[in-house]
From Swiss-Prot:
InterPro entries: UPF0145_dom_sf, UPF0145_YbjQ-like. SUPFAM superfamilies: YbjQ-like (SSF117782). The gene is ybjQ. Belongs to the UPF0145 family. This is UPF0145 protein YbjQ.
């Protein structure tokens, strides 16, 4: 499965548009990580805990996106948009959503 934020794939021709596909992941953030991440932010450091959670959420969302595309018989997803949001009380959860168009391609 190929993923692209562009509307085309170099070297491939889109032969069929299969439909819009989406993937979402919502992960809760641990209160202690939140506290220490806040301290790191104050002193200008990076928050490894948040970065790890963000990567994990993005991977889950892309797995879901690919699964939906495969179910439609597609071999690629183009025009992908990635959105990040904090949700829940006081932004206690992280949501990553991805969407794109599932397509069938040929060389």
């Amino acid at each position: 499965m190929q993923f692209s934020t562009t509307p085309t794939l170099e070297g491939l021709t889109i032969v069929e548009y299969c439909g819009v596909v989406t993937g979402e992941a919502i992960l809760g953030a641990n209160i202690f990580r939140d506290f220490f991440a806040g301290i790191r932010d104050i002193v200008g450091g990076r928050s490894g805990a948040y970065e790890k959670e963000l990567r994990k959420a993005r991977e889950i969302a892309f797995e879901e996106l690919g699964s939906q595309a495969r179910a439609l018989g597609a071999d690629a997803v183009v025009g992908i948009d990635i959105d990040y949001e904090t949700v829940g009380q006081n932004g206690s959860m992280l949501m990553v959503s991805v969407s794109g168009t599932a397509v069938k391609t040929r060389r």
